[in-house]
Amino acid sequence: LMTQPDLLLLDEPLSNVDQSFKEEIQEKLKKILKNSKITTVIVTHDSYEAFYLGSRCGIILNQELKQFDDPYNVYHLPNSIEVVNFLNRGTLIPAEVTSPKSLENKDLGTITGNFMKPFPIGSKVKLLVQPEDLHHDDKSNLKFEVVDRKFRGTNFIYTLKTPSETLIPVFVHSHHIHQHEIDEKFGIKRPIHIDHIVCF
């Protein structure tokens, strides 16, 4: 940095850093790069690291740039199934478009929201469902079996199995009064509304 290069390349700069120090170093690195005003390309396989450090993120798969956008859009508005699979932050479920603002899935029922890309009514699509898209409700009559539960500090990530054997991830705040065990039934709040409907 002392030489003030026009372009700085950091290839997996934090890959060997212990997790307990990683976030602290990420924070310091972000401040240094911002203050230096040097254009920096950071190569990483950690999407969370890329989202935190980058003002723009590029997803490269099979030597091709699949998406280049701000971190929010890469996460919430992936432009291909390849990007969805690479990020591994949700699941794709079959659905049918029933109106300009709704679609139907045989397990979840009617889902409303804003389509990021228009589809003709009657189209068979794959709907991206991310962990934050569905909300827990113990009183709901729409219940699925819990097959996995991961504690992530501020939240749990539940994996639910639907009658059609689809696995759907759902976030629940860790302070929620009732935590569900494996094999228990988990209620999903209705009506289901997803702000950004992403389909392929």
Where do the model's predicted regions map?
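Secondary-structure boundary/capping residues
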Residues: 38-41, 92, 155
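Small-residue-enriched segments and motifs
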Residues: 27, 81, 95, 144-145
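Glycine-centered flexibility sites
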Residues: 63, 69, 88-90, 95, ...
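C-terminal boundary and immediately downstream tail of ABC-type ATPase nucleotide-binding domains
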Residues: 76-100, 128
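Non-catalytic connector elements of ABC transporters
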Residues: 90, 101-200
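ABC ATPase nucleotide-binding domains
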Residues: 1-82
